[in-house]
Regions:
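N-terminal phosphate/diphosphate-binding loop that engages ATP/GTP or pyrophosphate donors
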Residues: 1-24
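Switch II (G3) loop of P-loop NTPases
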Residues: 17-20, 29-51
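Structural beta-sheet core signal
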Residues: 41, 63, 91-93
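Inter-motif core of Ras-like GTPase G domains
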Residues: 46-69
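Conserved C-terminal guanine-recognition region of P-loop GTPase G domains, centered on the G4
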Residues: 72-94
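Beta-strand-loop-alpha "switch" segments that mediate conformational coupling across diverse proteins
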Residues: 97, 108-137
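C-terminal boundary of histidine-terminating zinc-finger modules
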Residues: 132-150
Length: 162
């Protein structure tokens, strides 16, 4: 966030990073929900006390997943918990390699898990890492680029499913 603030020269960049006590996570999230239209909580897919609290306090659960066997194995238990909590998780495929047979196999396995898979996805593009490293997003660079269109499509799909 600091590099983004430095680049744009503004205190209000539309993103707020919050730190809070994870021992009282559900109450913390409820308090935050009153102040913002959307809150995004980034957490690993592993099953921990904190992850369980985040899922319980969430209105919706969107799960970015790289279509690889390792990511799939790490994500399946998380999806099970989200479904048990009736959050109807939606998978957003991330770092997708076009025309990769592995991608098709992983999509098939994710469908078998019963989770909904978003139509929109993010390809594996260097530009995502490059822009992030300087505190910017791909849409900041060029709103008409393929990467920007992917991000906009994912964002629109999230809004439609909220």
């Amino acid at each position: 966030l600091d590099s983004r603030k430095a680049y744009y020269g503004a205190d209000d960049i539309g993103i707020t990073k919050l730190d809070f006590d994870t021992r009282d996570l559900i109450d913390e999230i409820k308090s935050i929900k009153r102040k913002y239209d959307f809150i995004i909580i980034d957490s690993p897919p592993s099953i921990t006390f904190e992850t369980m609290q985040v899922v319980k306090a969430s209105d919706r659960v969107f799960v970015p997943v790289q279509p690889s066997p390792v990511d799939l194995m790490a994500t399946l238990p998380f999806l099970k918990i989200a479904k048990q909590e009736r959050k109807n998780p939606i998978i957003i495929l991330n770092r997708v390699m076009p025309r990769a047979k592995l991608t098709d196999a992983m999509i098939l396995r994710l469908r078998y898990s019963g989770a909904k898979i978003a139509r929109s996805r993010l390809s594996s593009k260097v530009i995502f890492a490059e822009t992030f490293s300087v505190g910017r997003g791909v849409v900041d660079i060029s709103v008409t680029s393929d990467a920007s269109k992917e991000v906009i499509n994912v964002g629109n799909e999230i809004l439609r499913n909220f």
